[in-house]
Amino acid sequence: MHILGIDPGSRNCGYAIINYAPHVNSLKLIEAGIIKIKERDLQTQIMEFVEGIDLVIKNIHIDEVAIEDIFFAYNPQSVIKLAQFRGALSLKILQEIGNFSEYTPLQVKKAITGNGKADKTQVAFMVKRILGLKGEIKPLDITDAIAIAITHSQRIKTNDVHSTPNLQRAMPLKSLSANPSKGCI
């Protein structure tokens, strides 16, 4: 099974494809790289980003996709720009693959190192150790993408891939009404 891990960014997008064999619990790095996005107008940048993702998807058959979720940032403009890239990425993945999973940086760090507050060097060390890689992986966007793919493989192993742990219903879905007079939406 090929898992594509993506660390989206508005300047650099890290990606990694790992082969996961669940029956023998084996992980192997197939390909990893960076999609560099040049400083241009936003529409051109988004097109370059999507074209880069398209090349990755069309080059190797992908079974599962895992994307790092948007996290808190101090600059609202950066978050808005990243959200636009994420929207384009989400649409492309849905069109080509059919679905994807998302993981927060905290979830990835905890899955890879056991510590949700681990720094990037600790994550990089564990990624290399898990995959048995020698040498340094640069830039860290690639390491993050590999870590995201590994995190997804762990969720597959525990059959927890498509769960929604944050979803809590106060009442059964069938009892919700579209009638505003009843106070439900």
Curated annotation (Swiss-Prot):
Localization annotation: Cytoplasm
Q: Among its keywords, does the record have DNA-binding?
A: yes
Cofactor(s) required for function per UniProt: Mg(2+)
Q: Which InterPro entries match?
A: RNaseH-like_sf, RNaseH_sf, X-over_junc_endoDNase_Mg_BS, X-over_junc_endoDNase_RuvC
Q: Which residues form the signal peptide?
A: none
Q: Which reaction does it catalyse?
A: Endonucleolytic cleavage at a junction such as a reciprocal single-stranded crossover between two homologous DNA duplexes (Holliday junction)
Q: Name one GO biological process term.
A: DNA recombination
* Domain of life per record: Bacteria
Give GO cellular component annotations, separated by semicolons.
cytoplasm; Holliday junction resolvase complex
Positions contributing to Mg(2+) 2 binding: 68
Q: Name one Pfam family in it.
A: RuvC
**Keywords assigned by UniProt, alphabetized:** Cytoplasm, DNA damage, DNA recombination, DNA repair, DNA-binding, Endonuclease, Hydrolase, Magnesium, Metal-binding, Nuclease
Q: What is its EC number?
A: 3.1.21.10
Q: What is its main location?
A: cytoplasm
What residues make up the catalytic site? Answer: 7, 68, 141
Q: Where does Mg(2+) 1 bind?
A: 7, 141
Cite the cofactor comment: Binds 2 Mg(2+) ion per subunit.
UniProt-recorded Gene Ontology molecular function terms: crossover junction DNA endonuclease activity; DNA binding; magnesium ion binding
The disulfides recorded in the entry are none
The entry's function note states:
The RuvA-RuvB-RuvC complex processes Holliday junction (HJ) DNA during genetic recombination and DNA repair. Endonuclease that resolves HJ intermediates. Cleaves cruciform DNA by making single-stranded nicks across the HJ at symmetrical positions within the homologous arms, yielding a 5'-phosphate and a 3'-hydroxyl group; requires a central core of homology in the junction. The consensus cleavage sequence is 5'-(A/T)TT(C/G)-3'. Cleavage occurs on the 3'-side of the TT dinucleotide at the point of strand exchange.
Subunit structure comment from the entry: Homodimer which binds Holliday junction (HJ) DNA. The HJ becomes 2-fold symmetrical on binding to RuvC with unstacked arms; it has a different conformation from HJ DNA in complex with RuvA. In the full resolvosome a probable DNA-RuvA(4)-RuvB(12)-RuvC(2) complex forms which resolves the HJ.
Xref: HAMAP family: RuvC (MF_00034)
What's the family?
Belongs to the RuvC family.
Q: What is this protein called?
A: Crossover junction endodeoxyribonuclease RuvC
Q: Which organism is it from?
A: Helicobacter hepaticus (strain ATCC 51449 / 3B1)
